[in-house]
């Protein structure tokens, strides 16, 4: 049975870590197949999530289909007008970025809807302007590009894990708003999403990945290393939202403990902001303001 409380100690050679959560010491062993009771009980409502249970599956699927029909209309409009759209997906590890992207693109024409998920930079790329390798993937006329993580690596994982210098981090926070103003001036519609989840929910999803043979590939050594760096990531998240939430690049912040509500509201937000032909407001519905808000103040 997984250990619920400190002062119990991690087994020698194990990957168990001692965590401080809400003023209490906990032991979490990701390799133990039994999910600790305290995680299972607290995961969904963690981080003050406003709902007690998931969105009903039937309601979710019916709503998602309507929204995906609207996304097909968006593609026809983009192809007819040459409009360009980019959506950046950032968030906590295991927050559901990939799932939100898949829900968006599932029924779009792959010839003009593209996902960018860059690996670590090559030696050549490390010698270039930081933004250069991202610019190379930007959309052409009529194209919708979605980033599964983006240039905002330099605002989160890189400074937390020591992959950039403090000066590079500070320089990025100054340059990102100017970079995004250039994107807007070029006529590209830029969406930026930060998907947030509670700590217990993150632990539950990590545990699910570890013990599901179809999902274990999603769990990286970086995820394990980050288990004890929650507060560091929180500080970097808050600073990023404060410094880079601008008129040209506003952040839409999503509470992501329920993946269904998260996906629905991500798509609704984009459809609401795009002025495309044949737009069906009734099919889109209203963004849930308990789930999606704007900028750094939403999570306070």
UniProtKB/Swiss-Prot annotation:
The keyword Nuclease does not apply. The keyword Magnesium applies. One of its GO terms (biological process) is ATP biosynthetic process. Changing residue 202 to A: Loss of activity. Has low activity with Co(2+) or Ni(2+). It catalyses: [phosphate](n) + ATP = [phosphate](n+1) + ADP; [phosphate](n) + GTP = [phosphate](n+1) + GDP. It is an enzyme of class 2 (transferase). Changing residue 205 to A: Loss of activity. Its EC number is 2.7.4.-. Belongs to the polyphosphate kinase 2 (PPK2) family. Class I subfamily. Homotetramer. This is ADP-polyphosphate phosphotransferase 1.
């Amino acid at each position: 049975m997984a250990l619920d409380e400190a002062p119990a100690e991690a087994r020698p050679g194990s990957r168990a870590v001692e965590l401080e959560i809400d003023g209490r010491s906990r032991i979490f062993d990701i390799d133990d197949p039994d999910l600790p009771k305290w995680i299972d009980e607290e995961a969904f409502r963690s981080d003050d999530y406003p709902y007690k249970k998931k969105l009903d599956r039937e309601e979710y699927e019916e709503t998602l289909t309507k929204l995906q029909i609207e996304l097909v209309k968006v593609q026809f409009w983009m192809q007819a007008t040459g409009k360009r759209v980019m959506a950046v997906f950032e968030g906590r590890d295991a927050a559901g970025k990939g799932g939100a992207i898949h829900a968006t693109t599932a029924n779009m024409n792959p010839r003009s809807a593209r996902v960018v998920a860059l690996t670590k930079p090559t030696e050549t790329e490390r010698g270039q302007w930081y933004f250069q390798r991202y610019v190379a993937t930007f959309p052409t006329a009529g194209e919708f590009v979605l980033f599964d993580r983006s240039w905002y690596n330099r605002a989160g994982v890189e400074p937390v894990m020591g992959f950039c210098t403090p000066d590079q981090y500070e320089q990025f926070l100054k340059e990102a708003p100017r970079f995004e103003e250039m994107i807007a001036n070029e006529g590209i519609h830029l969406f930026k999403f930060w998907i947030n989840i509670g700590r217990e929910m993150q632990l539950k999803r990590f545990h699910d990945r570890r013990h599901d043979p179809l999902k274990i590939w999603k769990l990286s050594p970086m995820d394990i290393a980050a288990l004890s760096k929650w507060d560091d990531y929180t500080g970097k998240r808050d600073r990023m939202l404060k410094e880079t939430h601008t008129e040209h690049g506003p952040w839409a912040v999503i509470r992501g403990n329920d993946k269904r509500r998260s996906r629905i509201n991500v798509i609704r937000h984009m459809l609401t902001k795009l002025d495309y032909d044949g737009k069906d407001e009734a099919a889109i519905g209203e963004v849930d303001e308990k789930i999606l808000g704007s900028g750094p103040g939403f999570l306070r």
